[in-house]
């Protein structure tokens, strides 16, 4: 089960999170690029690149927003966690209505999604100096400085 969680569920949760940033950045007219994983790039699919250690993390980079306002940047930074939360609620609803089985896989998916929400909204910079979503929100509200790329 560990391998399923680490090599399948966690990358899917990461993809959902990054897709939230991507969708909202596109809604504001931004050009985007996003990545799943770290290390050497394996391949690209449009703006998505998959890296060697695809199960480790993800990031999103955007520029040229049509609406280059503080609220637009905050919306983009919050969108990853919002997508994770929407999926948590959807999965729980589908389990409660017996559409999905009460499976450990779905519980792990919800767990990893909560993990992503918690740590992405906590304000910090990682070892590479990239800001968490929470730090990016803090910086854009306090200093008017949009961060790029974001985790």
Where are the predicted features?
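Long, highly hydrophobic alpha-helical transmembrane signal-anchor segments
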Residues: 1-24, 81-105
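Small-residue-rich helix-interface/hinge motifs
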Residues: 5-64
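Alpha-helical transmembrane segments of multi-pass membrane proteins
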Residues: 10-14, 112-120
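Transmembrane helix-loop junctions in multipass membrane proteins, especially transporters and channels
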Residues: 26-30, 96-100, 124-128
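Individual transmembrane alpha-helix segments
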Residues: 59-81
